[in-house]
């Protein structure tokens, strides 16, 4: 049996995938731009 690897934490979620984390890097800003262009209702976690 393999262990359950997903241990949810909202703090870790926000820090790695949140809006401010995205805005902090050039690549992250490109991610947001792509999601805006696609018309996503939610841009980030």
Swiss-Prot record:
Q: Does the keyword Cell division apply?
A: no
In the record, the note on similarity to other proteins reads:
Belongs to the bacterial ribosomal protein bL34 family.
Annotated Basic residues bias: 11-20, 31-45
Q: Which InterPro entries match?
A: Ribosomal_bL34, Ribosomal_bL34_CS
| Gene Ontology BP, a term | translation
GO MF annotations, alphabetized: structural constituent of ribosome
What protein is this chain from?
Answer: Large ribosomal subunit protein bL34
Q: Which Gene3D superfamilies match?
A: 1.10.287.3980
Per the UniProt entry, what species is this protein from, by scientific name?
A: Shewanella oneidensis (strain ATCC 700550 / JCM 31522 / CIP 106686 / LMG 19005 / NCIMB 14063 / MR-1)
Give positions of region: Disordered: 1-45
What ranges does the record list as Polar residues composition bias? Answer: 1-10
List the GO terms this entry assigns under cellular component, sorted alphabetically: ribonucleoprotein complex; ribosome
Pfam families in the record, alphabetically? Ribosomal_L34
Kindly indicate whether the keyword Ribonucleoprotein belongs to this entry: yes
The protein's superkingdom reads Bacteria
Keyword list, A-Z: Ribonucleoprotein, Ribosomal protein
């Amino acid at each position: 049996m393999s262990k359950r690897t997903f241990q949810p934490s909202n703090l870790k979620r926000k820090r790695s995938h949140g809006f401010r984390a995205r805005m902090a890097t050039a690549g992250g800003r490109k991610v947001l731009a792509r999601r805006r262009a696609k018309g996503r209702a939610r841009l980030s976690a």
